[in-house]
Amino acid sequence: MHIDNAITTTIETKTWRKSDTTWTLGLFGTAIGAGVLFFPIRAGFGGLIPILIMLVLAYPIAFLCHRALARLCLSGSNCSGNITETVEEHFGKTGGVVITFLYFFAICPLLWIYGVTITNTFMTFWENQLQLAPLNRGVVALALLLLMAVVIYFGKDLMVKVMSFLVFPFIACLVLISLSLIPYWNASVIEQVDLSQISLLGHDGILVTVWLGISIMVFSFNFSPIVSSFVVSKREEYEPEFGREYTEKKCSQIISRASILMVAVVMFFAFSCLFTLSPQNMAEAKAQNIPVLSYLANHFSSMAGSRSTFSITLEYAASLIALVAIFKSFFGHYLGTLEGLNGLVIKFGYKGDKTKISSGKLNLISMFFIMGSTWLVAYINPNILDLIEAMGAPIIASLLCLLPMYAIHKLPSLARFRGRPENYFVTIVGLLTIFNIVYKLL
């Protein structure tokens, strides 16, 4: 596959600024959240061969899809215009409404997913690590959501600071856990590879496993919510001095490096989990509807014979890190969901007039809807991977893959990017992810 020269000799002779490093880490940190804790389950579900194929696809999916979205954001005439303003400029007010809906429905299902996840993670920690009697699911979900609602309502600024602070400790913990699992690696996943029994088609075939894995990669390797802000920042910094073409290449360079970091950390974590567990263990984790760290904690707690202090520490650390990761991701996506829902309420409930309702009342109304719907989904307890594949990933793909490809096909300002092989790749990734909805209904 051809990936055009985003990193050119000219760009390499320019100074790499501190702000470029900051944004590289910012994009990287945005993507590394609770979604990563489910990727090893889907990736390892089919054994070694599908995850090796996903390893090959991971960087192109992460880099090319986000670069396409960045190019759309760069196509607006206003350096300070965000993606909504850019889409409105190109496609009118209807386009602005569509992008507002897409943003809201791309983020809100993620909150539902995290609501289910944090409830299940807390309950399995309570029952397996603390060895306490089972609790009522509805009460647990309500208590956890009320706790987060109180933190959000009374300490938004503190929440943002804590959330930002937790990004890199969480990444460090993922790397440390991946390294810590090495002594527990085994060859079972390799021994189970039987080339004579490999099936390409069918429900458990390699093609279907990789297809569903692409959806989880789109979900897990996703920093699209921050791409618009990133592009605006880089345009304001570079475009007046070096021009738009250079700014586009600089954005591509930063996205490329962030994608490399992200793929390296997530794939190492996935392989470490797979070599510690087995495809059968991954199937159990999916059936139990818990993230892989919670399953690892339960796995270590059920080990026969005498256990080392290290394995006991890892058992508790895995559960606590999972809880922190989900809290972090929930808070981050809550802010985006609140902003999107507030925009929809003002646009359709008050005809765009912000003066007709106070911000406090608007936030309270939106909070009741968000928390109420999240509690209901958490209580019902749908399978998280199925929810990701049927709702979260397809909506993200429509925004991350298909919208930029449509813009490149239609807009004169993006005409120079037409006809490139990577466009077909991004389009296929988007369509495959969306077609998961049809597959889930069959």
UniProtKB/Swiss-Prot annotation:
Extent of the signal sequence: none
Main location: membrane
InterPro entries: AA_transpt_TM, Amino_acid_transport_2, Hydroxy_aa_transpt, Thr/Ser_transpt_TdcC
The organism's place on the tree of life at top rank: Bacteria
Keywords carried by this UniProt record: Amino-acid transport, Cell inner membrane, Cell membrane, Membrane, Symport, Transmembrane, Transmembrane helix, Transport
Chain's role: Involved in the import of threonine and serine into the cell, with the concomitant import of a proton (symport system).
Name under which the protein is recorded: Threonine/serine transporter TdcC
Species of the source: Yersinia enterocolitica serotype O:8 / biotype 1B (strain NCTC 13174 / 8081)
Lineage, top ranks: Bacteria, Pseudomonadati, Pseudomonadota, Gammaproteobacteria, Enterobacterales
